């Protein structure tokens, strides 16, 4: 089961599918969502319908959390290269800054992904847009500084040991 703050609402995000948007002001540091569901290895993830694969979140080298429902409000967080939210641990999202009503709640998938299960052309439109989101973006040195303390634990350990 995923959770979305009552200060946000999941709805259509145009070409991006579904997203979560603030319906009340959200303060920096507030918990805005958490991911849940069942943990599956990549081999099982690959057998699920495409939408469910795209809504999974990688939590370890070969483990992905998948929602029990095809779409839950708490799993509608899109990627941005300049995100409004960041990961705390493997499954909790917190506001990185104050978020105004109407703003989309986003996080950078580089902070949790190390595989190609959800690679795509980025359309975030920010000044720091990487153009393509890949499972290897976590290796970019600039992101180590930008997202210090916001990487999923398995990636934080890799960064500490490899870089």
Locate each region found by the language model.
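C-terminal SET catalytic tail plus cysteine-rich post-SET Zn-binding segment of SAM-dependent SET-domain
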Residues: 79-163
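Catalytic cores of histone-lysine modification enzymes
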Residues: 1-86
């Amino acid at each position: 089961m995923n959770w979305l703050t009552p200060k946000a609402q999941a709805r259509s995000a145009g070409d991006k599918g579904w997203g979560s948007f603030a319906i009340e002001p959200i303060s920096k540091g507030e918990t805005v969502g958490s991911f849940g569901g069942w943990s599956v290895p990549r081999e099982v993830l690959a057998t699920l319908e495409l939408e469910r694969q795209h809504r999974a979140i990688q939590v370890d080298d070969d483990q992905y959390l998948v929602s029990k429902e095809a779409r839950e409000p708490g799993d509608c967080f899109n990627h941005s290269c300049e995100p409004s939210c960041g990961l705390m641990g493997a499954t909790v999202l917190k506001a990185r800054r104050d978020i105004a009503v109407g703003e989309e709640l986003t996080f950078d998938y580089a902070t949790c992904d190390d595989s190609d299960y959800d690679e795509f052309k980025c359309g975030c439109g920010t000044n720091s847009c990487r153009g393509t989101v890949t499972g290897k973006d976590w290796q970019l040195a600039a992101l180590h500084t930008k997202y210090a303390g916001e990487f999923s634990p398995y990636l934080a350990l890799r960064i500490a040991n490899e870089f």
